């Protein structure tokens, strides 16, 4: 496979209150033979992260075909694992649903942040997502005492498999 460097194809404009800075942690989802939806994480003026997407034709990647004006996934309620932000990291399509695995974070007093893994599901081809719970599906535990982050999920031979980063010392 030969890669062709295209450079920067998207910047947040700052026109949306939820997307003032950054278009980071991209997740690519192929819509048809040449159309792609690219999910990304952005920050608001309070440094909280939310998710949106834009769509391109791979043959004209600098031309934005569609862009969300509202976030598709937002920080959680006060006190939840994702109250400071959400960052999508893995997307799996299974039948008619899309499963978005994301890192939720909050800011405790003794360390800069605390990460856990959440799940949101779309039943409208990835245009919107709904969290399955206010709580994480994976968080610190006796084997992963410091943090869990960045899940990569696949559905293989009727099994869901997750690979993730663990903070060990």
What residue ranges belong to the model's regions?
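Beta-rich carbohydrate-recognition and catalytic domains
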Residues: 1-84, 92-150, 154-169
């Amino acid at each position: 496979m030969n890669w062709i460097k295209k450079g920067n194809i998207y910047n947040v404009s700052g026109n949306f209150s939820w997307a003032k800075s950054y278009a980071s942690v991209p997740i690519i989802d192929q819509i048809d033979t040449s159309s792609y939806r690219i999910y990304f994480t952005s920050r608001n003026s309070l440094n909280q992260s939310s998710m949106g997407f834009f769509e391109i034709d791979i043959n004209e990647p600098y031309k934005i075909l569609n862009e969300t004006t509202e976030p598709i996934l937002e920080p959680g309620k006060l006190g939840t694992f994702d109250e400071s932000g959400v960052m999508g990291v893995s997307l799996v399509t299974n039948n008619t649903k899309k499963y978005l695995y994301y890192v939720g974070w909050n800011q405790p007093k003794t360390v800069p942040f605390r990460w856990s893994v959440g799940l949101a599901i779309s039943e409208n081809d990835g245009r919107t997502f709904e969290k399955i719970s206010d709580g994480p599906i994976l968080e610190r535990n006796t084997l992963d005492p410091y943090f869990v982050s960045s899940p990569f999920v696949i559905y293989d031979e009727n099994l869901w498999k997750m690979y993730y980063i663990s903070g060990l010392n």
